[in-house]
């Protein structure tokens, strides 16, 4: 809650991870209710604060939210640039949560920019990594992964290429799996 975050900021020291986690949850909640302009505004504030504190984790988390919300507020080029800078500062070992959400933001930028073929290519490249990192075992990352896969498949199928039927089946499969989520 905003009150909990206020207490962490005003009264606690050495709790950067906890503050970042709280901000991440707050921004995700705003994303889920479609308040993307507010996500964009707050994430930019958090990014400036994290940079001033030399807080790499906070800066990367904020940049991921800027990228996702940036697409929704007609700033896909900025979203891609923020992702590039954030990932330059992040570990290249493994496929971490930050990598998943960077791929998600890039896929949504591709879809926004009318490049469903590129979005689907990204899904196909990332999917084995998503599976290996066990992101399909945790509800929120499983739902996010399946949604981005379904959206990319549907967008490319709408282009009507030779793969349209296969892509629609992939989309239907993801939709059926998503329908089982609670």
Language model: regions and residue ranges:
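Acidic, Ser/Thr-rich, low-complexity intrinsically disordered regions in fungal proteins
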Residues: 1-10
